Amino acid sequence: MTEAQTACATTETPVAAPAAPRWRVADVIALYELPFNDLLFRAQQTHREHFDANAIQLSTLLSIKTGGCEEDCGYCSQSAHHDTGLKAEKLMEVDAVLAAARTAKENGATRFCMGAAWRNPKDRHIEPIKEMIRGVKDMGLETCVTLGMLEEHQAKALAEAGLDYYNHNLDTSPEFYGQIISTRTYQDRLDTLERVRDAGINVCCGGIIGMGESRRERAGLIAQLANMNPYPESVPINNLVAIEGTPLENAQALDPFEFVRTIAVARITMPKAMVRLSAGREQLDDAMQALCFLAGANSMFYGDVLLTTGNPRAEADRKLLARLGMSASEASQLSA
């Protein structure tokens, strides 16, 4: 080797080793296994470092295109693969969506989410959805949409319309995923999330628990979310609603304390995220919902229906927050 070659060899930049995950599944399991009081104490401490512990964001979710979805998600009433009696409907008109958003704002919501039951939107769908986004934002509401998988140009178009958040859940851990859905891969979901992030839209990504997964698999979902770089700004945690006609209609109900533990673990591992109580709140009594707030949930979906499943009535939610001395926050950007 010549002197020049030797010099080149010795100054060559070494290849960096892959970054270690911030949270190993074993670490997340260890959080789950803490005594309940210790877990909630730690979660509440973490929560108070970044948020007003007595403020809850109220979100409303509207199904802007219902039923007839090509995917075979085992939990979903909107899948064309399942006989749930749900009638497929076309995309709602822009004016009807904006009217629903006005009602949501009048009822106290500060965030308006629009969901469409598609595998992926067609390009012809993007323009009316951009109109919906702009109209909702003009009302001073935060916007979120969930439309299925996105192409890069579609994500950019939504960003240009001013979309605040795009929701695309992982649903469960990579290991359990194949037992829930076969028509879309885990990597498909991660690819869409990357396109959303690259377009400059905040990521809303969480999952569903109570689908028959083990605690290890719940921990696997949380680890997957927490190890995203960065982790999602918004993390909805859904409690399975077992719907007649779906493959999971006979799923055993989850212990509500396990749901609260999941909220706490999400808060500890993703300290600055909005952790959102989503579907399945009807299965939690007021005391359990209060424990979820103590565990670090700082948003809840508000209104009588979430897409196609029931939800506690808005008046009951207002009364619960008043009993707890909590108030509705103006927006989700509460983190210090």
Swiss-Prot record:
InterPro entries: Aldolase_TIM, BATS_dom, Biotin_synth/BioAB, Biotin_synthase, Elp3/MiaA/NifB-like_rSAM, rSAM
Binding site for [4Fe-4S] cluster: C69, C73, C76
Catalytic activity reported: (4R,5S)-dethiobiotin + (sulfur carrier)-SH + 2 reduced [2Fe-2S]-[ferredoxin] + 2 S-adenosyl-L-methionine = (sulfur carrier)-H + biotin + 2 5'-deoxyadenosine + 2 L-methionine + 2 oxidized [2Fe-2S]-[ferredoxin]
Keywords assigned by UniProt, alphabetized: 2Fe-2S, 4Fe-4S, Biotin biosynthesis, Iron, Iron-sulfur, Metal-binding, S-adenosyl-L-methionine, Transferase
EC number: 2.8.1.6
Pfam family, one: Radical_SAM
SUPFAM superfamilies: Radical SAM enzymes (SSF102114)
First-level EC class: transferase
Any one GO BP annotation for this protein: biotin biosynthetic process
Recorded metabolic or biological pathway in which this protein acts: Cofactor biosynthesis; biotin biosynthesis; biotin from 7,8-diaminononanoate: step 2/2
Cofactor list: [4Fe-4S] cluster; [2Fe-2S] cluster
Domain Radical SAM core: 54-281
GO molecular function: 2 iron, 2 sulfur cluster binding; 4 iron, 4 sulfur cluster binding; biotin synthase activity; iron ion binding
Lineage top rank: taxon: Bacteria
Cofactor: record remark: Binds 1 [4Fe-4S] cluster. The cluster is coordinated with 3 cysteines and an exchangeable S-adenosyl-L-methionine. Binds 1 [2Fe-2S] cluster. The cluster is coordinated with 3 cysteines and 1 arginine.
Binding site for [2Fe-2S] cluster: C113, C144, C204, R276
PANTHER family in the record: BIOTIN SYNTHASE (PTHR22976), BIOTIN SYNTHASE, MITOCHONDRIAL (PTHR22976:SF2)
Role summary: Catalyzes the conversion of dethiobiotin (DTB) to biotin by the insertion of a sulfur atom into dethiobiotin via a radical-based mechanism.
Alphabetized NCBIfam families for the sequence: bioB (TIGR00433)
Family in the record: Belongs to the radical SAM superfamily. Biotin synthase family.
Quaternary structure note: Homodimer.
Protein name according to UniProt: Biotin synthase
